[in-house]
């Protein structure tokens, strides 16, 4: 129970704009809901942590192009299993932990942010009109712009369920096998999921380099082990080749056939092609250029705040895949950052009382780590433990649903909001 004094001592309501309702954004929002009500944040792992001594009047606005939380990690299975797909997308209004009068969700996209005036311009997906939204604190967590099949094309849950259904139908009709192009994390997981869920379909993975995961700063031992598990799963591997052209061939009935031309002159035919090659780019076009690196990532301080050179920098935070920070982009890192941004912004709110000095928590440098779900097994790498794999590793890292329950329960999203 809260052990905080009345909110009446604060003369105004704090307006927080969260851009992006995925792992980092929702973690930040949930943390602020806890702290503003005088509770220990649900993500606080500090032993004997004490709740804030004061409650705060707060209004959180979350802007997202989607109408709900989508479990991005589960994409390789969601696009191969209709039943699983329906589980991975939950509309924001159906999440018990977010049914609070202190938070609202707006489906749309942010076009621009004026750090000086603290005003964001938002394109409302429903009205198709641009509106101005004033804020006191901004937490940018809109991630990377990814393309299908890394993420679904749909922006609404009902559309996504139909999209997944059609995609699974294409797999069932792929009598001439399936080709996955790209040996990054998504391509690797997708190929093994297809073999697990559709064992009667031949699956071929084509990658332009000599090893899978060639773009990641990971040891050769890890990459080679992933390649071995792909082969053990029955995936045919073609390394060192680029696909130059893909052509649809006319067939009778529902059977579809695709012709793929490789750089070495070979021709391959498949009933279904999944292109998992794409360069994800940060969704930061709405932010000032001074806050971004040349690649478009947000430059942040260890507190997750914008660089000091920007106006009102202390009131602007960025978290997750869109920021320039060490380590491989992962949902765990995004949630970790979201917690930091929320705690530090809450400290600044408390500091409006002249007697309170804010105490920030800071990010530490993160080494490259990775965990891949490959059918019934998983492969992990950390600098301390090296490469590990096995069904027991899969159970710990992903459970039975590609980490959905682990993430959902960690955020405690089934627990009803308590006033």
Language model regions located:
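Predominantly flavin-linked oxidoreductase catalytic cores and closely associated redox partners
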Residues: 154-239, 246-247, 324, 336
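C-terminal, flexible cofactor-proximal segment of oxidoreductases
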Residues: 108, 328-333, 337-419
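Catalytic nucleophile loop
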Residues: 22-25, 184-188, 342
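FAD-site-proximal beta/loop scaffold in flavoenzymes
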Residues: 157-175, 267-336
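A Rossmann-like FAD-binding core segment of flavoenzymes
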Residues: 101, 105-108, 112-113, 200-302, ...
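Beta1-alpha1 glycine-rich phosphate/pyrophosphate-binding loop at the start
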Residues: 3-106, 192-218
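Intrinsically disordered, low-complexity domain-flanking/linker segments in eukaryotic proteins
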Residues: 36-58, 251-259, 309-313, 353-357
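FAD-binding core/adjacent interface of flavoenzyme oxidoreductases
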Residues: 2-19, 100-179, 276
